[in-house]
Amino acid sequence: MLHYAYVKNINSNSTYRYAIVFASRAVADEWWHAVSTSAIVKFSDSIRRVNAQFYTHDVGQANAADSLTVNGVATQFLGKVFFTLLDDLGGRQLSIIPPLHFADHISENSFYIRSKVSPYEYWYCPLLSNSNATNLVYVSRTERTRFRVCLAEKGTAGTVMIGSDEIVITVPSLSRSIDVTDSGQVILATAPQSGLKFSDLLSKFTVGPTVYKDGQSLDTRELLYTDDGEKWELA
């Protein structure tokens, strides 16, 4: 699905205003990662991300549109992103981009994790009567648990996460992290799963068998890790 954003010139209220079209939400976040970490300092200093659909640039330093054509910035996105220069303030026209409703993938924020195909199915860690969590993670249509997702690298709170980033998923109230057993069961552990990437969270987990107790369905299913997983999203 296409992703849209605006760019505004911080030095003027009337010029160098753009609408950007990205091939996908992931491309938008990856473009921002490339720009914000570029060794071409005039670009990393010029362009700022206000939120997922609004950026600013200091045209006196660097024009955001040029990020696609200046070597060392974000030329790898030339075929996946385009900028359209909007009318100046006096043009009396504005191209309204469609609002997109989603959770921004910011490191150390907390999220519900739900199925992209069946958005009423959520990751869930049930609590026992003694307030201790079971060690298994489930998928439920009636219950849900908030998880904190953060980059594995320390000191990166507030950073936009992209697919290649290594992450840690925790349940803050329990001081436990998501881990995966050798058989693929998703569990809560004191140490997180090593090498887990953000793209794995979104595509390498699947729903297992229904859980029964005393012959009765508990309306939950096991969560499993697999290379051929389902699509998940943060909410």
Question: Where would I find each of the regions flagged by the language model?
Answer:
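Lectin-like carbohydrate-binding module/patch detector with strong preference for beta-trefoil
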Residues: M1-A235
